[in-house]
Amino acid sequence: PVLPCAMPDNSVHATTRVTVHDGTGESLAAELSRPFDDALVYSRSVYLQRNTIMQSFDIETDGTLWYLQLGGNDPELLYVLRGAPNESPKDYMMLRWFGHGTNFAVEEQGTERYIWIGSNGNKLSDGSYSQSNTVSRLKYSPDKNRKLDLCGGDTFFIKDKWNVHPAIDTDNDILCITASTTGVRDFIFYRLSDAL
């Protein structure tokens, strides 16, 4: 597909062609362009912890699904849930005041799992939390009776950036953080091993 790109004020324009490969040299464009059907569904009809929006998800190499869900009537909460496809999550942990949960990533380290997520969210006028100022790497510790506040684990601050969202690629030693400045969205790349 061809994707147009532009600055918010349209002062700079670009067009890029994107080709997606599945590692075998085959393009996935044909697969992704066919009509939606049951063969494309990985998991369905899963009830999460709250009757609220799932903000994002990740999938482990073994197929385990991870969900990030808003707290509903508890706007300061995010739920990180883990489970098998087509099944209710087996456990979860709660994060308080982290932000909106727009994105997160799961890092696999042997039998341990770590969550990379925006943290230190700001309370907005509508009572919701958003615009995280830091990124945290948290050891996944499911406990239904404990809430982790603001940040935890290893926490990283990028000066003059907000609304930060991490992504990782452990195979290629990449940590990417997308963040906002005034009117611009930045993509900042680091070696993951430098952060650890």
Enumerate the predicted regions with their spans.
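Hydrophobic, aromatic-enriched interface-forming segments
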Residues: 157-196
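Blade-loop segments of beta-propeller domains
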Residues: 78-113, 119
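A short beta-strand motif characteristic of beta-propeller blades
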Residues: 39-48, 88-95, 148-158
